[in-house]
Regions:
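Acidic, polar-rich N-terminal leader regions of halophilic archaeal proteins
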Residues: 1-90
Length: 90
C-alpha cells in the first residue's frame, strides 16, 4: 500500500500480531481476542484514514468472528495475512 504509515504504529501492530499468533499456537483464545481488540483500537486511533486502516479493521473483525466460533486455524491465517500488509521492520 502506498500510504505512509507511522513507524511506531506499525511496530505496535506487528508486535500485537506476533502476540496473537503465539497465543493462538498455545490455544489461548482469550489473549488472542484481547490482542486483536487492541490492534483494532490502534488502527482506528493511530493509522491515517484510508485503505490501510479499513483493511486492518476488517481483518480484526474477521479474526474476532472466527475466534467466536473457535476456529483458531482460520484466525491464524487472518493474522498472518494481516502481518503481510505491513512493511518489514528495518
Amino acid at each position: 500500500m502506498s500510504e505512509d504509515l507511522p513507524s511506531d504504529v506499525v511496530a505496535v501492530i506487528t508486535q500485537l500480531c506476533e502476540k496473537t499468533r503465539q497465543a493462538l499456537s498455545e490455544g489461548d483464545c482469550e489473549t488472542a481476542r484481547a490482542a486483536v481488540d487492541t490492534i483494532e483500537r490502534v488502527a482506528t486511533n493511530k493509522l491515517p484514514e484510508g485503505e490501510h486502516r479499513q483493511t486492518v479493521r476488517h481483518a480484526c473483525e474477521r479474526i474476532a468472528a472466527v475466534l467466536a466460533d473457535d476456529e483458531t486455524d482460520d484466525a491464524l491465517a487472518y493474522v498472518e495475512a494481516l502481518e503481510r500488509r505491513f512493511p518489514a521492520a528495518p
